[in-house]
Amino acid sequence: MKRNNTWLWRFLIVGILLLVALLPVTTLAAPDWSACVVDESSKRVPGVLVRESYQNYSAESEGHEEDQYSDANGCVHFAPKLTRASLLRRGIQIAYSAMAGVHASFGPYAYVTAFQGDALGDDVRGGYEYAWKGSPRHVDSSLVLRSH
C-alpha cells in the first residue's frame, strides 16, 4: 500500500509542475515610447514614417513592427507592448536562442527608426543607436534625420 502512495505523490507533483509550466506569464515586450523626428538643425519634421521594432528573444521566435507617421509637431507615440508566453515556451525559446552561440540574443529588445526618402533617423546616445532592453517602462526619443 505504501508503494502506491509514493507513486501517487510523484504523479501529483509532476502534474502540478506541468500545470505551472503551462501557465502564461505576461511581460513587457516594448515600452511606452514617445519619439519626435527632427532634422539636423533640430527642427521638428511632420509626416515622417516612424517604425517601432521589438521582440522578446526569451519568449518568442518572431519580431514585430508598428508604423506611425509623425504628427504636425513631428512626434509619435507607441503604446506599451506585452508578450504572453508560458514558462515552458520561454524555456524552449531560451534553449533555441542559445543555439546561436555568440550571436544569441535573450530578453526584450526594441528600437525606433524614422524613414523619409533616403534619410534615416535614429536615437543616438553617446555615439550609439539606442535600443531598449527591458527598462525603463517609458522612453522619450529624438530621431535625427540624416541622408545616407
Describe the role of every protein-language-model region:
Residues 1-6:
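Short, Lys/Arg-rich N-terminal segment immediately upstream of the first membrane anchor
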Residues 22-24, 65-68, 102:
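Beta-strand-rich interaction surfaces with strong enrichment in secreted/lumenal proteins
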Residues 37-47, 72-73, 116-118:
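A short, structured loop/turn motif at beta-sheet edges
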